[in-house]
Amino acid sequence: MSILHNIVSKKELKRRMFFETEPRLTLSFYKYFFIKNTQEYRDRLYKTFYKYNVLGRIYVASEGINAQISVPKKYYSILKKFLYNFDIELNNLRINKSLDNEKSFWVLCVKIKKKIVQDGIKEHFFNPNNVGIYIQSEQVNSMLNDKKTIFIDMRNSYEYAIGHFENAIEIKSITFREQLKKVIQLMAYAKNKKIVMYCTGGIRCEKATSWMLFNGFKHVYHLEGGIIGYVHDARKNGLPVLFKGKSFVFDNRMSEKISDEVISYCKQCGKSSDVYINCKYSSCHLLFIQCENCSVKFHSCCSLECMKKYKFYMLNNDLKKISY
């Protein structure tokens, strides 16, 4: 029986990614639909993705599939056809192409999950297929200029920090589950108003529109393909892109630049910056925004305390190497 999971070390996989020269496309897709045998579904996907050197993260659950992947450009058409024929539910699946194609993933991981996005919803009669109205770039821009329409950002606070639509409401939270609880309470006054919800690729805002409709909101819309889909559609049709800043992404790139505006600030000095890093001291690993000057000053650490611990750790490692 073949091994259907990665057995190569993280260090080696990262080395391979760094030296790879083959052009790749970073893609994302999702679909809410019922999957009866998730294990069989997962294994079939893994075999084909592995065969074509696909890297990335794919979640399979009884409620559907959610994927962010890096595909060799030469295999894109083959894999697109494979997905369309893999399951009738995936026929004409919307596949988002990232705005850039830097090295995004270094391992293939296909996991079975209880849900493809953790929402905390336990209501028995909730129907995730009853969703809001899809809108594309022209209508998005028109509604952004309508003061009676409310835009709600359904991403985490750290995503909102580096980029968002102007005047969009931030539902402050670090989890989607928490946001769904808050948004119903915070927007209770707007049940009869037009509400537009958005996220990176569409998966969270689609479920959020279902949740809003379930809770009695009347006029709920969401961006087809999320921020990524909006930007592609606006550029394709020669329309202004009204999203400001960067779009946070959950892979090695950390973000995609959409506009030239820098709307966030360095955690340490307050200077304009939109570069996320993880604290160099591995026991901390805090995700935070740091400018170039502070990166040098703090050795890519989030604080003086972490910098001291990091230096001490590195010194000990050097001494161990010398002793050998």
From Swiss-Prot:
Reaction it catalyzes: uridine(34) in tRNA + AH2 + O2 = 5-hydroxyuridine(34) in tRNA + A + H2O
Group of enzyme by EC: oxidoreductase
Keyword terms, alphabetized: Oxidoreductase, tRNA processing
Source species, domain of life: Bacteria
Positions annotated as active site in the UniProt record: C199 (cysteine persulfide intermediate)
Domain Rhodanese residue range list: 145-239
Protein function: Catalyzes oxygen-dependent 5-hydroxyuridine (ho5U) modification at position 34 in tRNAs.
Similarity field: Belongs to the TrhO family.
Record protein name field: tRNA uridine(34) hydroxylase
Organism: Buchnera aphidicola subsp. Acyrthosiphon pisum (strain APS) (Acyrthosiphon pisum symbiotic bacterium)
